[in-house]
Regions:
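Short, extreme N-terminal segment that most often corresponds to the first beta-strand
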Residues: 1-42
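Short edge beta-strands and adjacent turn/loop segments
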Residues: 7-18, 48-63
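Long, low-complexity, intrinsically disordered polar/charged segments
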Residues: 25-26, 33-46, 55-73
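Generic marker of "main functional regions" within proteins
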Residues: 36, 51, 55-56, 99, ...
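Charged interaction segments
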Residues: 44-48, 62-148
């Protein structure tokens, strides 16, 4: 079972925010590798984002692999965008897409010349940055309150 330890922070409500969704495939038996990657990702984004949700499931395409799905809520004023997120995670070989509607995405796969981000257990990843106005109403009402 994966665990998360976070510090208490004062919160203030905002009307607009960004949902950061991170989906990472982690290799290796047991939960140790997944726990390590989860803690690394939390350390990268906890200073600027609120943890919304996370869970892990087996990855059916690769034996002994786990899919980590981690969601954060960022203040609307977060200007670094998905490119800044990719830079924080590191590695090389990311494919970044920025759409006209404000959504942003990035993908990393172990292909020619790609430099693995975070650790050797990092198999692949997808990142999505979605404005709160694009989320379904039930997702908006469940959102945590964010720092101003």
């Amino acid at each position: 079972m994966l665990t998360v330890e976070t510090l208490e922070r004062p919160e203030a409500a905002t009307d607009e925010w960004l949902r950061l969704g991170v989906r990472i495939v982690v290799t290796g038996r047991g939960g140790a590798n997944s726990q390590t990657v989860l803690q690394q990702v939390l350390a990268l984004f906890w200073p600027v984002a609120e943890l919304y949700d996370f869970y892990a499931t087996p990855y059916p395409r690769l034996p002994d692999a786990t899919v980590l799905r981690i969601a954060f809520d960022l203040p609307a004023g977060y200007e670094a965008g998905v490119s800044g997120i990719v830079q924080s995670i590191g590695g090389a070989g990311w494919t970044v897409d920025i759409y006209e509607d404000g959504e942003q995405a990035a993908c990393w796969k172990p292909e020619d010349g790609a430099v693995r981000p975070l650790c050797d257990h990092f198999h692949s990843a997808e990142i999505n940055l979605i404005p709160s106005s694009h989320l379904a109403e039930f997702r908006k009402s469940a959102a945590p309150r964010l720092l101003q």
